[in-house]
């Protein structure tokens, strides 16, 4: 077992990066072990159920990061449409600063690829989208939007920023994210 205090974190970070860049099926445990600089025993110690358990951990970590970032914008004292617009504009800056690398829409590998592997992973992916929508939904409800309309708007917004990010990375252009940001006031206002 590794004496490194962050062996588990290194494994999760490496697996997340590889799953995002190569996909679930193309990423092997041996590569994760090698690239994370961790002994094989560490991976099986932290993830005794193997690759699927590791993928589930990566899914949950990704969700937590996005929820935290989204909440930072949505919980500010500005209207929800401005908050979501600012969140998307931050994605624009991130895309430009990273030269369109290291950013992958959640739906790209996780929801599409892993949700077909097992019911547990599918449910985890579903929960991620629901968690993201809930951040927006709660703010819309606080602002007095009808519950059903708020749920629909939150779903559309998550679909919009995921789709815009996918197009941004594919086209290597911030145009789709900028267009999405422009549409937010009409959707949420």
Residue positions per predicted region:
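Hydrophobic alpha-helical connector segments
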Residues: 71-101, 153-157
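Helix-turn-helix
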Residues: 10, 14, 18-57
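N-terminal intrinsically disordered/low-complexity leader segments
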Residues: 1-6
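Amphipathic alpha-helical packing segments from all-alpha helical-bundle domains
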Residues: 116-142, 152, 182, 186
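Amphipathic alpha-helical segments used for helix-helix packing
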Residues: 58, 82-86, 97-120
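Amphipathic C-terminal alpha-helical segment
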Residues: 94-98, 116-120, 158-176, 187-189
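Hydrophobic alpha-helical segments that form the core
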Residues: 106-109, 148-167, 179, 183-186
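Short, basic, alpha-helical segments at the C-terminal edge of helix-turn-helix-like DNA-binding modules
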Residues: 59-65
